[in-house]
Each structure stands twice: as structure tokens, then as C-alpha cells.
Amino acid sequence: SKGRADRSVTGLLAPPRQAALKDIHEDVLTEDVADRTYALYGQLVHLLLERAGEQDRNALTEERMFTEVGGWTISGQTDTITLTEDDGWVVSDFKFVTSFKFKRNYSGELVMPAEYEQQLNMYAHLLRENGFKVDGLKIVAIYRDWSKMEAKRDRNYPQLGAETHDVKLWSEEDARAFMEERVRLHQDAETSLPYCNDEERWAKPDKYATVPERASYSTVGSMRLHGRKTLQTK
């Protein structure tokens, strides 16, 4: 929920076209309850963790904050923020996700999903705007499909059913600039509806297989062509 705001932090991360169309057609949109199963599980997990956090005197749970950006009111609700020894705060966000969201690459390196890094750094900006000093950001990932067998077989697969991952903390300037740009894009979409870009559509470059003349099969492998639909070989 965005509360009394024009957009929430998670709303700003949505494609501007999607958000604008949702605003226009909000009264007629429907959703199959069966598609909300994982969301329900996630809410239950959040509820249990929040109740546990309420027992920690140095933690604040479900804090909703507001700030003004470009004439809009922006809100964000953190799962948990924890006070550090030097009077700073660490933001922790719970994610109930598939294990492959945090599977390491072939080099054994964990690549943090961009949308999570963006989300938490916008939370950090909100906290700073409300007088908090932010010292760190963390994702608490709870894997809904974790497999002990897969963890033994693949060292790049998450080795535990739940893990905590540090998130890169941006500078105050970078976090502010990012939020301002997202607000601008969403405001522009209200008067001139943009198309979603490739990243927002999860699109990948087209690939075309090379096929020898008089052959009904493609050669092993493929190649990317930009601006050309066919490749002829002689």
C-alpha cells in the first residue's frame, strides 16, 4: 500500500507505462485469487518475522515514511530497521523468493538483483529525509523452493533455506538522483504514455540460426544479428 502518497517506493520501480495504465483502469482490474498464493505465504512469513522483531528494543518494524519529490509525495514501508552501536540504522527487507533468485554465477559470485538494490537505497533515502542515519542495507532471503539435495549437488545454489545478503549502500546523492529520475518518468507517463523498454519487458536480443542451402537443419550454435533477418552463405 502507498498510503496517502502519490507513489510508493515499490510503485516507482514498476514500469511507468504499467503504473499509469493501472491508475487509469484501477476500478476494472481483477486478479485470480489462485495467483496470490505465494503472496499470501510471503505475508505470513513477514508477519511472523515482524512479531519477532517487536521483541527487540533496538529494532523498529513496519515503519512507513514519506518525503516530497518533484511535487509528489513518496512513501515507503521498511520491514525492519535496527539501531547500531554508533547510532546508525541498518535496513533489513524480507524476501520470500525462489532459490534461483540468489544463485551464484559460474564464478561463484552473487549478483544482487538490481530491483532489490534500487528498492533498499530508496528506503535509505526516505530514512535520511526523516532524520535517520543509515549504516547498512540487508536482504533476508527465505527460499520457498529450497532443496537440500540441490544444495549438495551445486555449490552455487543457496546452501541454506534462508540467507542474509548485504546490499550496496549508495551515496546520498546517488539515491536522491535515482528517486528523482523515477518520479520524473512516472509523472511524464501521465501525459505521454511511454512504451516499456527491453529490460522492463524481460526481452533479450533476437537470435538466428544459420542454415546451409538445401538443408533442413540448422548448424550447431547461433549468432545475433542486429537489423538483419537473414544470413546467406555460399
Predicted segments with their positions:
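Hydrophobic side chains in beta-strands
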Residues: T82, F94, I139-A141
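Generic solvent-exposed, charged/amphipathic alpha-helical segments
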Residues: H46-E50, L120-A124, E180, R184
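Metal-dependent nuclease catalytic regions and adjoining charged, substrate-binding loops involved
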Residues: G70, H125-K234
